[in-house]
C-alpha cells in the first residue's frame, strides 16, 4: 500500500521562488528607486500575497495517510516547515520596512499626482493674476554750464535749485553738473592751458567747481557749494562758499582750483562737453535722458517730472499748482 495520497495542494517549489522574487524586487527598489511605478509595486505585492497564501496552504496540509495508491508529495517534516516559515517571516519583515519607508517619504499629495504609467507627476500650482508694480525709472539730468554766464546764473537760481528741492529727495534724478561751457583747453606737457568765455576768473571758478564735484561726488553734497559759487566775480568770493559749506576742505580746494589738478579736471569736463551731439551753441545746455531739452531752461521741474514714470506725487502736486 502506498504511504501517501495525491493532493491538489501547491508544491513547496512554488513558495521559495515567489517569495525570493518578491523580496528581491522590493529590496532593490527600496535601495535604488523610491519613486518606482505604482503599477510595478502593485504587481509585486500581488505576487507576494499569492506566494504567502500558497505557502500557508502548504504548511497547513494534513499529513497524508498510508492508504494512498499514487503518492505525490512526501510527508512534510517539521524542519522543512520551519525553513519555509523563515522565508515568510523574512518577507513580511522586508515588506513592513518598505511600507514604513514609503509612508515616511510619501510626496505631498496636494502637489503631486499619479500619471498614466503610475509614476509621480508634479502639479504646477496655478497662480492667480499678479499685479506688477510699475518700475520707477531714474531720470538722467546733465547740465553743461559756466561759472559767470548770466543765463546759467538765472537758470541755477530759478530752475535748478527749485527742481532739486522738490525732486532731489526722491532719489530718482541722476544729476551731473559739468562746468566748462564754451571754454578751450590746450595740453602743455603735463599741464593744460585754458581760456574761458568770460575771462581767466571764470576759468578759476570753473576749476573750483570741478574740484568740489570731484571731491564730494554726490549732488546732495556738492550742489549747495556750486549753487553758491555760480555768478561770483572772483575766486576769493567763490572760496567763501567753500568756507560756508566745506570748512575743513578750504586749503585743499584752494590748492586744487589754482593748480594742475584743477586745470586737468576742467579739461576733462571739456572732453565731455566736446562729445555732445549736436555740439553746444548755448549755455546752459540741458540734457534729459540723453536728449537736449531747451524747454527745461524755463521750467526744469515740469520737464523732469514728465520724464518720470510713474510720476511721483510731488510732481503731480507741482503740475496742479501750475494750473
Curated annotation (Swiss-Prot):
| GO molecular function ontology, one term from the record | oxidoreductase activity, acting on a sulfur group of donors, disulfide as acceptor
Membrane-spanning segments? 13-32, 37-59, 87-104
Main subcellular location of this protein, as a coarse class = membrane
CC terms in the record's Gene Ontology section: membrane
Query: Record's InterPro entries?
Result: Interferon-induced_GILT
Q: How would you describe this protein's topology in the membrane?
A: Multi-pass membrane protein
Q: Which UniProt keywords apply?
A: Glycoprotein, Membrane, Transmembrane, Transmembrane helix
Please indicate if the UniProt record lists Ligase as a keyword. no
Q: Which residues are glycosylated?
A: 35, 289
Location comes to: Membrane
Keyword Membrane (UniProt): yes
Disulfide bond entries: none
Question: What protein family is recorded?
Answer: Belongs to the GILT family.
Q: What is this protein called?
A: GILT-like protein C02D5.2
Amino acid at each position: 500500500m502506498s504511504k501517501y495520497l495525491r493532493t491538489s495542494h501547491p508544491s513547496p517549489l512554488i513558495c521559495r521562488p515567489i517569495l525570493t522574487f518578491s523580496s528581491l524586487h522590493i529590496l532593490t527598489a527600496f535601495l535604488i528607486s523610491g519613486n518606482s511605478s505604482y503599477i510595478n509595486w502593485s504587481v509585486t505585492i500581488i505576487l507576494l500575497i499569492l506566494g504567502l497564501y500558497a505557502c500557508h496552504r502548504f504548511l497547513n496540509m494534513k499529513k497524508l495517510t498510508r492508504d494512498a495508491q499514487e503518492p505525490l508529495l512526501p510527508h512534510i517534516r517539521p524542519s522543512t516547515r520551519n525553513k519555509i516559515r523563515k522565508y515568510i517571516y523574512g518577507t513580511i519583515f522586508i515588506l513592513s520596512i518598505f511600507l514604513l519607508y514609503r509612508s515616511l517619504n510619501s510626496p505631498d499629495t496636494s502637489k503631486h499626482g499619479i500619471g498614466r504609467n503610475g509614476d509621480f507627476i508634479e502639479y504646477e500650482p496655478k497662480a492667480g493674476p499678479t499685479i506688477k508694480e510699475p518700475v520707477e525709472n531714474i531720470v538722467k539730468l546733465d547740465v553743461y554750464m559756466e561759472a559767470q554766464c548770466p543765463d546759467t546764473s538765472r537758470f541755477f537760481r530759478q530752475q535748478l535749485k527749485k527742481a532739486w528741492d522738490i525732486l532731489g529727495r526722491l532719489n530718482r534724478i541722476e544729476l551731473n553738473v559739468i562746468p566748462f561751457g564754451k571754454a578751450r583747453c590746450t595740453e602743455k606737457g603735463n599741464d593744460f592751458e585754458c581760456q574761458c568765455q568770460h575771462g581767466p576768473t571764470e576759468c578759476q571758478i570753473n576749476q573750483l567747481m570741478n574740484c568740489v564735484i570731484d571731491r564730494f561726488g554726490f549732488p546732495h553734497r556738492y550742489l549747495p557749494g556750486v549753487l553758491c559759487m555760480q555768478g561770483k566775480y572772483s575766486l576769493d568770493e567763490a572760496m567763501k562758499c567753500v568756507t560756508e559749506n566745506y570748512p575743513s576742505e578750504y586749503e585743499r580746494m584752494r590748492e586744487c582750483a589754482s593748480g594742475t589738478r584743477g586745470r586737468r579736471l576742467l579739461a576733462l569736463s571739456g572732453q565731455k562737453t566736446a562729445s555732445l551731439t549736436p555740439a553746444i551753441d548755448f549755455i546752459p545746455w540741458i540734457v534729459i535722458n540723453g536728449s537736449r531739452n531747451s524747454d527745461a531752461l524755463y521750467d526744469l521741474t515740469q520737464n523732469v517730472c514728465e520724464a518720470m514714470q510713474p510720476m511721483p506725487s510731488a510732481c503731480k502736486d507741482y503740475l496742479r499748482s501750475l494750473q
